Amino acid sequence: MSQSNPILRGLAITTAIAALSATGYAIYFDYQRRNSPQFRKVLRQRAKEQAKMEEQAKTHAKEVKLQKVTEFLSMELAKDPIPSDPSEREATFTTNVENGERLSMQQGKELEAASKFYKALTVYPQPADLLGIYQRSIPEAIYEYIILMIAILPPANVASFVKGVVGSKAESDAVAEANDIDD
């Protein structure tokens, strides 16, 4: 037992020195932060650089995701094109919705599920209604992939819907601008 006493004493002294050093550094850092303009400037620059790096990382991640979705959608549509025959559209719709629902339940199959839902959307007569249903019923990650796919390659029925929304927005902006001029 007499041998453990010096070990414990050494451990206690080492712990006390480490705690005192950490406290001293914290006090020094706080003093520099409060009183040194150069130190504050360096801290602000580091914070700006960190924010810029994070923004670049987010942008790069979005670009990679967009590229991945573009390649996948192109490959998927080349492998299984959307039918143009009206009689096949209903069967295509039900098949793709069923496959999309089945795939959405599996982890890691979000992109495949989104492509099935996208194909169903392309043959559906009222895409706005179906998008609303998708938004309420499928997981958010899959819905985001569907929106990306629509942005990459808008189907004909969705393109007319999007153009209608953009056109009405442009018309309302023109009316608002005309009202501002008259004042």
Curated annotation (Swiss-Prot):
Mitochondrial intermembrane compartment spans: 1-8
Domain of life: Eukaryota
Predominant location category: mitochondrion
Record keywords, A-Z: Membrane, Mitochondrion, Mitochondrion outer membrane, Phosphoprotein, Protein transport, Transmembrane, Transmembrane helix, Transport
UniProt topology in membrane: Single-pass membrane protein
Biological process annotations from GO: protein import into mitochondrial matrix; protein insertion into mitochondrial outer membrane; tRNA import into mitochondrion
Subcellular location: Mitochondrion outer membrane
Cytoplasmic-side segments: 29-183
Transmembrane segments annotated in the record for this chain: 9-28
InterPro entries linked: MAS20, Tom20_dom_sf
Keyword Ribonucleoprotein annotated: no
Cited PANTHER family: MITOCHONDRIAL IMPORT RECEPTOR SUBUNIT TOM20, TRANSLOCASE OF OUTER MITOCHONDRIAL MEMBRANE 20
Additional note from the record: Present with 5680 molecules/cell in log phase SD medium.
Family: Belongs to the Tom20 family.
Function: Central component of the TOM (translocase of outer membrane) receptor complex responsible for the recognition and translocation of cytosolically synthesized mitochondrial preproteins. Together with TOM22 functions as the transit peptide receptor at the surface of the mitochondrion outer membrane and facilitates the movement of preproteins into the TOM40 translocation pore.
Protein name listed in UniProt: Mitochondrial import receptor subunit TOM20
